[in-house]
């Protein structure tokens, strides 16, 4: 249930800005303006009766502020009809001149608003996106099309790779034709210039190679930094969400031949392998022990020897993989290749949880005779809330001395009260280590010197005392080396900090300075930042949740916090992502919505070379949108207890204000999460609105991300309380709308969303929500993992009342709903089936029977085994249709019908 995280390369970055108040836009079709200016333009164009052609170069322009049904909707405000009388020519000229003046002023004001600490009520602001304009003539999307890739945007993964001699703008391409090479490195600019002297470097000519008669087919590849050898993974098998095992090989580029990573154990499965920055060695973990293979020898060096069932070296256990690092590695090379840092994880005291498989046998072993009828059981070391955690400590390996050592840090947390959440190598043998206490509300930043083998805490932050919140694990801290020629006298680092109630960027220098230079501030919050750094020019760039939390835009700022510049076109309400080449001369810009996604590689403004190449336009989706009828999306805010909460309302095609529509609320709602996003997405909710004809509403309530820490942290210690009240209040707002049938309102969610669906209908007691659907729900936070749960709830020993309140336990209230549905995979290693089974037991004990249940044998949290994923959504859709058709009312208080019984009896020749 870990929130989605993303990291960024530690390589040097450059900005994407060209000068004051500029953004990079290939079409040059829009000038920089605030959203308020765009709103005015939309209104003026509507008065004039004009329309916008939102082609690829004008994505999302102009049509976000009014709806296609002629309603300029400010909640229940009057609307301006699209067929109004045209404005006279003189009025147009005056309005145009006034608009020009306003745009000029707003251009300067926008950045000041965005990062100037301005806070305003957004309750009545409404934005609409309608990407399909076929009306009633279009084709309806089907449920199969939602999941078979019909509506999935094509997306190219650009893998930037550093050049062995400092070259910038190099791409690693896999899967090219045999004539061009299966794996190759190519200069992004020269590949479009046939006269260029920069030729591609072919690393692997073919898509496979042979080693001693064994054909090796790569599933993942990692070129060495000098591009002379490729580390290859084959025979990959999934472990948990992020981890996998396989056979590893070393492929020599010059000879085009391969060899096992460990020639003495070529068939043994390896958990993790990574290159030395010097390209002369590979460190790897096998059977939870670490080894080093130097390319100068066929022998491997044992770094550790006592790894096994309870001791992990270099790889995380289940809970650290899921909740802290969101990855399969806890191994870090120093930049000079002299040292390796790694975590040792001791699970000796962690209780086991058995996951049973009734149909499949994931371990691949054939049971002994007589054992075929018994399920396979996989025991996981899984620390539930309040249970013993794994003990994790940081260790180091001196490559030259072949020695493992650790460094004590005075004043650090006790072993049982420590979570290590990030490790970043600095220069001259120094390491930055971020750790928290068990409940994740006190942060320590330590600096370790591996040369002197000393360490000290350089920064402490009590987040609980600051705002009652917590520390979210992240791996985005960026080391900034000293560079006196460019004004940096000391080493430092950039981190995300809490400033004036928001997540902002800060620069700490020297490296042991506890007081930062705050780089960003104001209304918006940075997202997984920093995204990159231009060391030469002293610039940081980052992604920000823009003027509206559902947007993503890219900005840059100087190391001293001055010259905040937009990179993307902030006058358009858009959702962007970006990655940069290792020298930051080029950027891979990804537009994700609200219109059809596209991808481009562009040169950055600091680059002397001007370059732009469209990588993907998704023309197939543009064509499909001309054929199909999709829902319209209304983005707006509602005010609940003084908080402006983002809402997405999906309306069916040909929406009619005079009709009464059923409403389905869809949510996730986990702490720091976000579901209301302006991304192109045709999903199950689209199917419900566009095919079934229901309204779908999503509310990012209190506790979710990018609406300020005050709204986020209020939920701590009492998960589900404020979040469910927000959903109930929102449902009451929608129930009062003239186009909503208040007797047909339902809610559904998966995982944390499943918990929220149950908690909401429990709190509501059938007064507003009549139906609910929960997939893989947590029903008692005592059953979920410790690191995630205690971050938001403290321990059960410290907060027993909070855990009692958060549990789904009021069966009397649940009995007042018409009906609800629970679905769960029996092999869920994340949210255990224990949650649903104990919940159903409570219902049985209290004689509650207004529910349905569906278990999926051997499916994990994603519910895919044996066609299960399709069945989940088919069942969900059918159940929902039956609910809104009133079928479940017939089961609410069933009574015999004599006429039906008589007809049935005649079919079998009986008499009654």
From Swiss-Prot:
Taxonomic lineage of the native organism: Eukaryota, Fungi, Dikarya, Ascomycota, Pezizomycotina
Catalytic residue positions: 751, 828, 861
Cell compartment(s), UniProt: Vacuole membrane
The name this protein goes by in its record: Probable dipeptidyl-aminopeptidase B
UniProt key word Phosphoprotein: no
Residue numbers on the Cytoplasmic membrane side: 1-92
Family: Belongs to the peptidase S9B family.
Glycosylation sites: 130, 210, 346, 569, 656, 810, 897
Catalytic activity: Release of an N-terminal dipeptide, Xaa-Yaa-|-Zaa-, from a polypeptide, preferentially when Yaa is Pro, provided Zaa is neither Pro nor hydroxyproline
Protein task: Type IV dipeptidyl-peptidase which removes N-terminal dipeptides sequentially from polypeptides having unsubstituted N-termini provided that the penultimate residue is proline.
UniProt-listed Enzyme Commission number(s): 3.4.14.5
Lipid bilayer topology: Single-pass type II membrane protein
UniProt key word Repressor: no
Gene Ontology BP annotations: proteolysis
Top-rank EC class of the record's enzyme: hydrolase
Comp. bias regions, Basic and acidic residues: 7-25, 54-67
GO MF assignments: aminopeptidase activity; dipeptidyl-peptidase activity; serine-type endopeptidase activity
TM stretches of this protein: 93-113
Residues in the Vacuolar compartment per record: 114-912
GO cellular component term of the entry, any: plasma membrane
Gene3D superfamilies: alpha/beta hydrolase (3.40.50.1820), Dipeptidylpeptidase IV, N-terminal domain (2.140.10.30)
PANTHER family referenced in this protein's UniProt entry, alphabetically: DIPEPTIDYL PEPTIDASE 10, ISOFORM B, PROTEASE FAMILY S9B,C DIPEPTIDYL-PEPTIDASE IV-RELATED
Matches recorded under InterPro entries: AB_hydrolase_fold, Pept_S9_AS, Peptidase_S9_cat, Peptidase_S9B_N, Serine_Prot_S9B/DPPIV
Chain positions covered by the region annotation Disordered: 1-30, 48-68
Keywords annotated in UniProt: Aminopeptidase, Glycoprotein, Hydrolase, Membrane, Protease, Serine protease, Signal-anchor, Transmembrane, Transmembrane helix, Vacuole
